[in-house]
Amino acid sequence: MRLRKLMCTAMSAAIVASMAGCGQGKPAETTAAPAAAETTKAEETKAEETKAEETKAEETKAAETKAAEVSSDRSNMFDVIETEGRAIDYGNVDLTPTAEELEAMKKEPAYGKPVRYWMSDGCTSGPNVANLLGYYEEAGLTAEGVKGTSYTEALGTGAAEVAVGHIATMLVPSTNGVDLTFVGGAHIGCKSLYVLADSEYKTTEDLKGTRISTPNGIGASDYNITSLLLDADGINPQKDVELTPVETSACVTAMENGEISAALLSDTFAYKLVQDGKLRCVRSLLDADFQGEPCCIIAMNATFVKENPVISRKIVGAVQKAHSWMRENPDEATQMLIDEGLNSEDFDMNVKLNNSLQFGLSTDFTEAGLRAIAEDYILSLIHI
């Protein structure tokens, strides 16, 4: 489903909710004099403001309590938590085109041309794995990998047909005219907010008034993920903290020098540092309140999907089948990624982390997550 549609739905829901919260319903009939009516209106307004303040205070307290709970112990943060309806089993799906599908594919402009998939590593390597396992070929397609500086740009310009990437990276571009669309879920998790293990920062509440690194830049995925994590705890990412880009490799030193208090890092990068007692996680996309949302997603060039609907379904099926295989065969998948240079050499660490991501998300889970993410993003802007 196109994110624009989801965003419009989320916006409508948010607007309706705001109207419902602020509306006073049908006014009661009255014969009171204008002055009396004005007094009554003023009293009602004051009562509403008081109620709003009380509600805000309750929400803030609840957010602080939740933050304290989710930040207290993350010794098992990478353990798999099964959620009904989250995964989709594509492992036994035969991608071979039926006679009817093949005839339809032959009529599409992309027929006979190689599918260009974005070559990426780690948790976004599903399109690569689909090629390595022969799933594009099974679907009646040929494929070739492409590289560059930005999968968002590659999808938007038509330099690539399909990629897996962070929703947080593509959310805003997809609503600002970039020619891409979301077509399926990839996995949950993969990034968290870290502080020095011996620091005074225990929860996100403790980070108020400090500088936090969002390594890949203002407005990019790290910035957006950090904003959502903070906003979920009642912390305004624009007013209560300062978000600043510090390169991932320099973040620990910057923390030690007091230049930043925390950093949004990939769990793969931070894992060994946590094990060695250098870093500690205070908030994560793997926390219970974010496990109901996808982190990375399958995206395609929107015009390509419109002009080649049958071929597009086959492409998505190939990537989804790869994700299912990665979830069901974590050891083999991890070794494949290591052999292809798509994962670091630490086998045990990568098996654990890859397991926690729960590759292969169902359509229902993904759509519900997209709605929640879009709404959260809109609300975070409203709170500014």
Where are these regions (language model features)?
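Bacterial Sec-dependent N-terminal signal peptides
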Residues: 1-10
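Hydrophobic core
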Residues: 11, 15-19
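Bacterial lipoprotein signal-peptidase II cleavage site
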Residues: 22-31
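Pocket-lining segment of extracytoplasmic ligand-binding domains
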Residues: 167-169, 244, 250-338
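Secondary-structure end/capping motifs
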Residues: 306-380
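Conserved small/polar residues in nucleotide/adenosyl-binding loops
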Residues: 382-384
